[in-house]
């Protein structure tokens, strides 16, 4: 199957998108462009501001409108923060801001059987680091490497 990714927001989202692409490639799937026909589309969202939320909704709506037969999956802070709004947009797979390996498995299950899947958790209660593969070596001179996951409620801008 062929999947495409659209990433909004921070370096963590960029890293996690690269890791999910890597996981799909390891399983024998292809990664395509968001503008071409694919079996599934993943939108990794940001929710740091109201403007970011508006961009999320616009990208999700456009993707659903342009690809009515494809599986559309949304993960990241927006779906973690407001899963009801994401459900209302008719999304097939909804994941939060963690558990990327499980999210990829849900994506593959939904794409194979065209069914709805959800996996959300308490982001602030998450204490275990999810080890994901480093990515970005093909297109960049530097790879991103995630060294921390979770939160101790110290930042004022994060969800």
Regions found by a protein language model. Name each.
Residues 1-159:
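Proteins enriched for Cys/Gly/acidic motifs involved in redox and nucleic-acid/cofactor modification
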């Amino acid at each position: 199957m062929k999947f495409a990714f659209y990433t909004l927001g921070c370096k963590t989202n960029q890293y996690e998108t690269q890791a999910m692409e890597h996981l799909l490639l390891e399983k024998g799937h292809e990664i395509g462009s968001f503008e071409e026909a694919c079996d599934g589309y993943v939108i990794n969202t940001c929710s740091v501001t109201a403007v970011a939320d508006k961009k999320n909704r616009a990208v999700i709506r456009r993707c659903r409108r342009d690809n009515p037969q494809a599986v559309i999956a949304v993960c990241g802070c927006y779906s973690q923060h407001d899963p009801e709004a994401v459900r209302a947009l008719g999304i097939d797979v909804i994941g939060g801001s963690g558990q990327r390996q499980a999210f990829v498995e849900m994506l593959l299950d939904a794409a194979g059987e065209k069914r709805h899947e959800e996996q959300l958790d308490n982001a602030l209660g998450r204490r275990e680091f999810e080890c994901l593969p480093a990515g970005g070596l093909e297109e960049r001179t530097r790879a991103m490497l995630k060294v921390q996951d979770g939160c101790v409620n110290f930042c004022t801008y994060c969800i």
